[in-house]
């Protein structure tokens, strides 16, 4: 009798080259989990069917890179926001642009469709939230309360509320009919990246860069619980459709949470890097991530994931396995009711001005004429969108779940998709023959051309930096070559190992030095010690800690850090640039008004040593900020996340010009 085939819990479904340039955003359709939209620096929106290699439709019209995307609940419409602040809505069934919406003054950071009405909400780097009527192609309401970029917007399931998350560390709940903030949730110590409503209960979840997930009661307006001490910032969360648990997408892992009390039900290792969006369908979770121009999709079999009951990983408190308390309160929390038809659209809307309510018609008409929906694959397009226009059949057609591949070998723990595991990639690859055994590399007859390195090395990458993959791959067949011995193969594998160990040992020693200074002295001396090591990686590690606590920043600390920030902003490593931008933003928000006020103040009568010292520090900081402002101005034209960060810094530094 044949043994039962053991299938994988998580596996890589597909990898595609989605754009001719870097991918800047993507989104999954939540209804079927089979529709994927990607936006790129090439100013295009490409629509894909998950697990199919070819682009179904390419939407053009934007003139700047795509910053945010959203697909409607019925997967009939798609909205895209660009770097310039323009918004375009396409009808996927009709394959044409529906509306062009203008009004924001900066990048579009977040978008969401109203669940019932023809409305779209948009959040921007300009801190405004706007509600648009797609049918009338105008802004019907503008919500102003946030002080920094609005990173996520979500309508409540009944369509009456709107939740917004922003870089100002707050989550706000808006009453659409009244046009005002119902409540402001505070508690996060870092930018809030994502919010999600529970599908049925009055419960809201928020994830932040402070590496916590907070659950908020929307009836009593208080925090229900908080999941802390995650390893990475929280950027992607999703409630299970039945509301039994919350999924958190983290760096190379999926975590399953409960909230009353806070606990982690399960952890599944998935090699998806920084996952960008999640969707649940047919008891499978689909996750998508992107790196440069490629998009990867992954599947997790939820039937093999613990979603309630036992707590295999224990409560998230001091990393100790505790007994599971009896859940309380969830059965008493109110549930959403679908509003009547008259409530499906906001009431008491205010039109501040006719010019704001409507976009300029001549410019809009021209943009809509230039916007196109290019059908790249007619067969897939008809299969996905045309059946909606046909007569419904009974029972209706339902997409089958993705088949799980078998395990490579028997194991006891849940296996992740391994980096070296062969994966079927359906993008065309150059044809070449590879031998089955290692062979000696051919002796080069001439000096090889150096490989061009990227101008910016991304934080998420598929291969180590500084290692040549060709050293570890089989070479082409050559009759004059002899097969490598096992010793020679191991020698190639170990190549560079000693160098890496020396680098890590030196870095560890430097960090120990900084930690020793920090434990016996103040923050400025710790930063001085980090700068003295002449190792930017140590400075980055220290700044990543300091950036989490704004109260640690002092004026004398700025004089030491600003020269290092200037170096970080010009680094080729993305993570260094991100840390430099975060530190500079904190300095500008906390100290730039103080610096300008002190420099503009008239000289005092008599001798004031304290004031003279403060004036000297302010002059030094001002000079350094002027130097950095030139770098920020030159880089503000970049596309993608870097460009957004530099443009925000450029706005904050406008007073220096």
From Swiss-Prot:
Residues 318-410, 423-454 are annotated as: Disordered. GO terms for biological process: cell division; microtubule depolymerization; microtubule severing. The gene is KATNB1. Keywords: Cell cycle, Cell division, Cytoplasm, Cytoskeleton, Microtubule, Mitosis, Repeat, WD repeat. Participates in a complex which severs microtubules in an ATP-dependent manner. May act to target the enzymatic subunit of this complex to sites of action such as the centrosome. Microtubule severing may promote rapid reorganization of cellular microtubule arrays and the release of microtubules from the centrosome following nucleation. HAMAP family: Katanin_p80_B1 (MF_03022). Residues 351-385 have a biased composition (Basic and acidic residues). This is Katanin p80 WD40 repeat-containing subunit B1. WD repeats lie at residues 18-58, 61-100, 103-142, 145-184, 187-226, 229-269. It comes from Gallus gallus (Chicken).
């Amino acid at each position: 009798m044949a043994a039962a085939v053991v299938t994988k819990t998580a596996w890589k479904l597909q990898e595609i080259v989605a754009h001719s340039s870097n991918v800047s955003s993507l989104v999954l359709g939540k209804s079927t989990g089979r529709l994927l939209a990607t936006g790129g620096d090439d100013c295009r929106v490409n629509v894909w069917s998950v697990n199919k290699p070819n682009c179904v439709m390419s939407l053009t019209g934007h003139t700047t890179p795509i910053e945010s995307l959203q697909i409607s609940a019925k997967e009939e419409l798609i909205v895209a926001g660009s770097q310039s602040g323009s918004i375009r809505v396409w009808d996927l069934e009709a394959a044409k642009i529906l509306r062009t919406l203008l009004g924001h003054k900066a990048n579009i950071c977040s978008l969401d469709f109203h669940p019932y009405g023809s409305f779209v909400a948009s959040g921007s780097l300009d801190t405004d939230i706007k509600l648009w009527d797609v049918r009338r192609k105008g802004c019907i309401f503008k919500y102003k309360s946030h002080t920094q970029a609005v990173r996520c917007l979500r309508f409540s399931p009944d369509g009456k509320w709107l939740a917004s998350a922003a870089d100002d560390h707050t989550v706000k709940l808006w009453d659409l009919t009244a046009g005002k903030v119902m409540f402001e949730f505070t508690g996060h110590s870092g930018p809030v990246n994502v919010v999600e409503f529970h599908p049925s209960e009055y419960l809201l979840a928020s994830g932040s860069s402070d590496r916590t997930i907070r659950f908020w009661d929307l009836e009593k307006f208080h925090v229900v619980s908080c999941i802390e001490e995650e390893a990475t910032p929280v950027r992607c969360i999703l409630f299970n459709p039945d509301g039994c648990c919350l999924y958190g997408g983290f760096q190379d892992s999926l975590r399953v949470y409960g909230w009353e009390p806070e606990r982690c039900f399960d952890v599944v290792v998935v090699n998806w890097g920084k996952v960008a969006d999640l969707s649940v369908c047919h008891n499978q979770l689909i996750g998508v991530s992107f790196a440069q121009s490629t998009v990867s999709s992954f599947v997790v079999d939820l039937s093999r994931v613990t979603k309630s009951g036992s707590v295999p990983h224990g409560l998230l408190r001091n990393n100790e396995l505790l007994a599971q308390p009896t859940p309380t309160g969830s059965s008493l929390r109110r549930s959403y009711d679908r509003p009547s038809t008259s409530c499906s659209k906001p009431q008491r809307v205010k039109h501040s001005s006719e010019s704001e309510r409507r976009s300029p018609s001549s410019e809009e008409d021209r943009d809509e004429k230039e916007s196109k929906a290019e059908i790249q694959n007619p067969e897939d397009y008809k299969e996905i969108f045309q059946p909606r226009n046909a007569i419904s059949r009974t029972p209706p057609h339902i997409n089958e779940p993705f088949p799980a591949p078998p395990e490579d070998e028997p194991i006891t723990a849940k296996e992740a998709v391994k980096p070296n595991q062969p994966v079927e990639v359906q993008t065309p690859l150059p044809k070449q023959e590879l031998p089955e055994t290692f062979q000696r590399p051919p002796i080069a007859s001439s000096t090889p051309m150096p490989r061009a390195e990227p101008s910016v090395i991304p934080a998420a990458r598929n291969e180590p930096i500084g290692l040549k993959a060709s050293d570890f791959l089989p070479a082409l067949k050559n009759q004059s070559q002899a097969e490598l011995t096992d010793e020679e193969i191991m020698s190639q594998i170990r190549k560079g190992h000693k160098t890496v160990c020396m680098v890590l040992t030196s870095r560890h020693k430097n960090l120990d030095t900084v930690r020793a200074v920090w434990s016996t002295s103040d923050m400025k001396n710790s930063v001085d010690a980090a700068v003295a090591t002449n190792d930017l990686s140590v400075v980055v590690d220290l700044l990543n800690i300091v950036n989490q606590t704004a109260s640690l920043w002092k004026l004398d600390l700025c004089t030491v850090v600003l020269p290092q920030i200037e170096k970080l902003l010009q680094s080729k490593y993305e993570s260094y640039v991100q840390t430099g931008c975060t530190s500079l933003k904190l300095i500008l928000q906390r100290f730039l008004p103080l610096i300008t006020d002190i420099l503009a103040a008239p000289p005092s009568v008599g001798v004031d040593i304290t004031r003279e010292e403060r004036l000297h520090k302010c002059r030094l900081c001002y000079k350094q900020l002027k130097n950095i402002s030139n770098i920020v101005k030159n880089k503000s034209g970049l596309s993608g996340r870097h460009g957004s960060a530099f443009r925000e810094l450029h706005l904050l530094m406008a007073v220096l010009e």
